[in-house]
Amino acid sequence: MSNVKRKDSKNRNLRNGESQRKDGRYVYKYTDIYGKPQFIYSWKLVPTDKTPAGKRDDISLREKEAQIKKDLNDGIDTVGGKMTVCQLYDKKNSQRKNIKRATEKGRQYLMNALKNDPLGMRAIDTVKQSDAKEWAIRMSEKGYAYKTIDNYKRSLKASFYMAIQDDCIRKNPFEFKLSDVLEDDTEQKVILTPEQEERLLAFMEKDKIYSKYYDEVVLLLETGLRISEFCGLTTHIDMQNRILNIDHQLLKDSEIGYYIETPKTKNGKRELPLTERAYQAIQRILKNRGKAQPLIVGGYNNFLFLNREGLPKVAGNYEGMVRGLIKKYNKYHTDKLPNITPHSFRHTYCTNMANRGMNPNTLQYLMGHANITMTLGYYAHGTSQSAKAELERLAC
């Protein structure tokens, strides 16, 4: 075997695996952890070399070699690290197929956002924390809400964690607090005080247009149901035992129309005892219910709440109704009500129950929350009035 060293165009000795192409670019050949040959390239052999005019600047071949050797010694998959962020996110999603339709659509939205952003086509082993932060800033500049960006960041963090577990990369570039990069401009959850709740219902009861929604709003305030659970209620209610059985949601999609989903969380299936106020509201709703179209959705029919066409109401119907209700109320009253959504009634219910001293575990069950932290920290809002009342109670 010849001991003659191969040299480059500058008469420098080349190491094993190194070579120089006719166009002047350096090549390093190595074997990956799967026993397959791989190649890396650079216009520079060592860091002090200058990149030829018109060529993209990059680190030197020797620097790349050092990183590869370190990765191979540590068992890092140098090939896997070359997959793009889009490919990584797709791989992560492929490992969990049994998901709700809303989750699937959320995945599509994030994938589309990645495809339309420079980050999506980046090799995962080139993504640094500064790149992830710049991505968050770009998303904000494009008009994405803070909460949406935070949810997307959480998904990407999980994807990169999988890449770490697979020995494709060493660090997670999404391991940072979004609030350190962007201002959290998420609007606080709006709840109605008991006095506001009373004023709103009094207005609805007398109004020619909104009086027909009175009992539905009462039922929302008395049960704390998610609006999709509320829309899924049917006429098959256990009125004798005064129980609402919650085991599904009714939703509507522009692509497939009405469809049924299981409750949002594993704790979503529950039996809600009806208060006297809720019981009376349901009786009136059943009495005044119009004629329903013959419709079966996911095995369910005879939905309780119908629109003018006799079809089931969905979240969008109530969102529009509540917007109009608040707008009309505020038009004729100086003591304005805050802008709310149907979900605000759920916040209000949870807060009312917490302020009345309901056992946290019982409240968690009634709300169908996944964990107690959500019950206590996310929904239960204290007010100056409730704080004063609680202090007065403790002083007795």
What does each of the following model-derived ranges do?
Residues P52-D57, N93-C168, T186, K208-I209, ...:
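N-terminal core-binding DNA-recognition domain of tyrosine site-specific recombinases/integrases
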Residues Q38-I40, K44, D49-K50, I260-R284, ...:
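C-terminal catalytic core of Y-nucleophile DNA break-rejoin enzymes
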Residues H236-L244, M358-G377:
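Short, polar N-cap/turn motifs at the start of nucleic acid-interacting alpha helices
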Residues R21-Y26, D32-K133, K287-G299:
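N-terminal DNA-binding module of tyrosine recombinases/phage integrases
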